[in-house]
């Protein structure tokens, strides 16, 4: 792997006008991009097509925050992989803990979605992470293994060669009141995730860290041997914040 992945999901934030302003500012700063970093942005569904169009002349990948596994049908309120491809998207975020907690997402449904994403040429960004209860009871490693294996369980041998990303987001570390994991703790968990994924896929795939990433901890995190990128929340919802973290990480990566 030659690149670090650093991107942000906006969750349920930004109007179309706000999304356009962010994308235009990111495009305007494109000349200062680092060749060592693959950037990505995941807007809400209502802005993905426009954001992708604005960033089409750059290397920034654009994604969606969820999708259904079916191509079409009676799934009121859902978005299909074909619809994402129609928007020219590159990535789809799957299995976020908020979807698992509030919308009934399971390891089974994440697996179905991962297979559908790969089948349609989308890069699945698979979110996994243990709760505080899991961590305190010593079940973190077991929970993460279950989530990794579940996410990859529907892939054929050929599909296992597709581009796949994981994002380790400990549930207790994300959100407005989240407590960032220490770099050592995150790196240890990510080593476990990478090992399990490698046992299934027979190759190493990138694993990003997400969970209260900010300008104060991004450099320490990106320097860890098993952290292949950062999945940023509110610290990157302002384009200046995103560009700041990108610049800090680029300097750190080049120094290493």
Swiss-Prot record:
Catalytic activity field: L-erythrulose 1-phosphate = D-erythrulose 4-phosphate
GO cellular component entries: cytosol
Chain residues that bind substrate: 175, 212
GO biological process: gluconeogenesis; glyceraldehyde-3-phosphate biosynthetic process; glycerol catabolic process; glycolytic process; pentose-phosphate shunt
Residues annotated as the enzyme's active site: 96, 169
Keyword Isomerase: yes
Keyword Acyltransferase: no
Localization (cell): Cytoplasm
Pathway: Carbohydrate metabolism; erythritol degradation
Predominant cellular place of this UniProt entry's protein: cytoplasm
Known EC number: 5.3.1.33
Gene Ontology MF terms: triose-phosphate isomerase activity
Name of the top EC class for this enzyme: isomerase
Keyword vocabulary terms for this entry: Cytoplasm, Gluconeogenesis, Glycolysis, Isomerase, Pentose shunt
InterPro entries: Aldolase_TIM (IPR013785), TIM_sf (IPR035990), Triosephosphate_isomerase (IPR000652), Triosephosphate_isomerase_AS (IPR020861)
Family: Belongs to the triosephosphate isomerase family.
NCBIfam families, A to Z: PRK00042.2-1 (NF000722)
Record's subunit section: Homodimer.
Functional note: Catalyzes the isomerization of D-erythrulose-4P to L-erythrulose-1P.
Identification of the protein by name: L-erythrulose-1-phosphate isomerase
UniProt organism field: Brucella abortus biovar 1 (strain 9-941)
Annotated gene: eryH
């Amino acid at each position: 792997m030659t690149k670090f992945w650093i991107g942000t999901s906006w969750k349920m934030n930004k109007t179309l006008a706000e999304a356009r302003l962010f994308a235009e500012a990111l495009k305007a700063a494109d000349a200062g991009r680092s060749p060592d970093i693959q950037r990505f942005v995941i807007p809400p569904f209502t802005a993905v097509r426009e954001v992708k169009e604005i960033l089409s002349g750059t290397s920034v990948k654009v994604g969606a925050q969820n999708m259904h596994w079916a191509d079409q049908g009676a799934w009121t309120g859902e978005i299909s992989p074909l619809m994402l491809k129609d928007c020219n998207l590159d990535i789809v975020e799957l299995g976020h803990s908020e979807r698992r907690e509030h919308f009934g997402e399971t390891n089974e449904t994440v697996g179905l979605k991962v297979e559908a994403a790969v089948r349609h040429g989308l890069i699945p960004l698979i979110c996994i992470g243990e709760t505080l209860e899991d961590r305190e009871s010593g079940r973190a490693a077991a929970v993460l293994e279950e989530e990794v294996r579940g996410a990859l369980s529907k892939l054929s041998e050929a599909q296992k060669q597709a581009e796949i990303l994981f994002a380790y987001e400990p549930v207790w570390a994300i959100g407005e009141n989240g407590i960032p994991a220490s770099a050592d703790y995150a790196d240890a968990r990510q080593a476990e995730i990478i090992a399990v994924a490698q046992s299934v896929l027979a190759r190493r795939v990138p694993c990003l860290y997400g969970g209260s990433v900010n300008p104060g901890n991004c450099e320490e995190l990106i320097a860890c041997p098993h952290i292949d990128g950062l999945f940023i929340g509110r610290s990157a919802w302002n384009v200046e914040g995103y560009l700041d973290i990108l610049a800090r990480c680029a300097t750190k990566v080049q120094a290493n």
